[in-house]
Amino acid sequence: MEAEALKFFIACVTAAGFGIAIAAFGCGIGQGLGLKAAAEGVARNPEASGKITVTMLIGLAMIESLCIYALVVALILIFASPMTATVTGLLTGAGH
């Protein structure tokens, strides 16, 4: 049982790590492309900078929320796992 709990916990931690890394990478790319497009739009039409800035900020907030959701899922995988208490006991030596 202890070995299975440890394997499950390692899988959860690995999945959480890869998940947040992929989410951060994707969000970074998306935000960079959005900022690039907004800067080009303001350069082409400076009079519309207010509307472009507001739209860009709303879009960036939406993109950032995706990364926050990935962080929440990663934290749930790590801390709300049913095997967390067992693995914590193993690591602190209380399991023996």
From Swiss-Prot:
Belongs to the ATPase C chain family. It comes from the Bacteria. The chain crosses the membrane at residues 9-29, 58-78. It is a multi-pass membrane protein. One of its GO terms (cellular component) is proton-transporting two-sector ATPase complex, proton-transporting domain. This is ATP synthase subunit c. Keywords: ATP synthesis, Cell inner membrane, Cell membrane, CF(0), Hydrogen ion transport, Ion transport, Lipid-binding, Membrane, Transmembrane, Transmembrane helix, Transport. It is found in: Cell inner membrane.
